[in-house]
Regions:
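Terminal accessory carbohydrate-recognition/targeting modules of carbohydrate-active enzymes
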Residues: 1-218
Length: 218
């Protein structure tokens, strides 16, 4: 085992600072510990110009947005984590797969059904922090995305490894749009008396068309 993990709630709403899409052990220039590199990955289904965001985050004053949990129709984790979403006539399945003995997570999206042209947008929200800390907006973070084959790589701070984000679909497009997202609230940290608000940085988003029956791996 390489020691990396993915941890969140069943509806993909992080409630603790230990939650993240990709958490892995690091050492070397950094103190030896687990680090959250990818905090969240927000998916958006687009049809006829209408956007349906599958993500879910909690902010202050009990505000949840964008309420993507309402599209969840099935969840199964008996062998691997599988979530099925239904948005109108669209049925999208998401599966989490780990590469054995490597700190590599693959997320497979399969368009099970759709009655019209469908586009999928993936927006990574980056943390690059110790699992015991919280990320705050700052001017030192490098919000640029650097091209690599089939995707981009990001590294917010020196001393961290590069985070390679790639897609199996050759014609997928990455749109650079660096920006901070503010005040994600982790309610279980607040209940324990700890700081529970975090800012996450996005370097941009991936966008690609997906056909019925097609699978694309992130």
């Amino acid at each position: 085992r390489a020691g990396a993990y993915n941890s969140t709630t069943l509806i993909d709403c992080n409630t603790r600072k230990y939650h993240g899409q990709l958490v892995l052990p690091l050492a070397g220039e950094l103190p030896e510990d687990n680090y959250v590199l990818l905090g969240s990955l927000d998916e958006t289904v687009i049809q006829h110009g209408a956007e349906f965001n599958l993500g879910l985050h909690k902010y202050g004053w009990n505000n949840f947005s964008p309420n993507g949990h309402k599209y969840i129709r099935e969840f199964d984790c008996e062998v691997i984590s599988k979530t099925t979403y239904r948005v109108g006539g669209v049925i999208l399945k998401k599966e989490l797969l780990w590469i054995h003995k490597r700190t590599q997570l693959m997320i497979r999206y399969t368009l099970v059904d759709a009655h019209s042209e469908t586009t999928l947008r993936l927006r990574p929200l980056l943390a690059f922090r110790d699992k015991h800390a919280l990320s705050k907006a700052n001017v030192e973070a490098d919000g640029r995305a650097y091209p690599i084959p089939y995707g981009v790589k990001c590294r917010l701070y020196n001393g961290f490894p590069w985070l390679n984000m790639q897609l199996s679909k050759e014609d997928a497009e990455f749109i650079a749009a660096p920006d901070w997202y503010y005040n994600f609230e982790y309610q279980k940290e607040l209940r324990r008396g700890y700081e529970g608000h975090e800012d996450l940085l996005t370097a941009g988003y991936f966008e690609f068309k997906i056909k019925k029956g097609e699978s694309v791996i992130f």
